């Protein structure tokens, strides 16, 4: 979503906060996920963070999960706790995979996308549990 797309969906405080990010891509990701949440829940929704750093909204019974990476964002909204993680298909996990995948997980498939899928699944579980990943 470009700046025109987020206009009207983000607050002046959020624009100021985004202005502090060094990378333009990170700035866009930050503003985009907030605009998506407000587009779905209403322009007046307040977005904050809980003690674990997870996003929360001021709507009873509404949970939000967010991930952003390399210019893309994913947002999940649910009536139960939720979490999401995304990574680009082009990211090479081959060297890191043995640190977060068990030998039996590594043996499951020769699919080169499996390490990315496992990474995202485990990262989403850490987010869901409100634990640092």
Predicted regions and their residues:
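Core catalytic alpha/beta fold that binds nucleotide/phospho-ligands
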Residues: 1-133
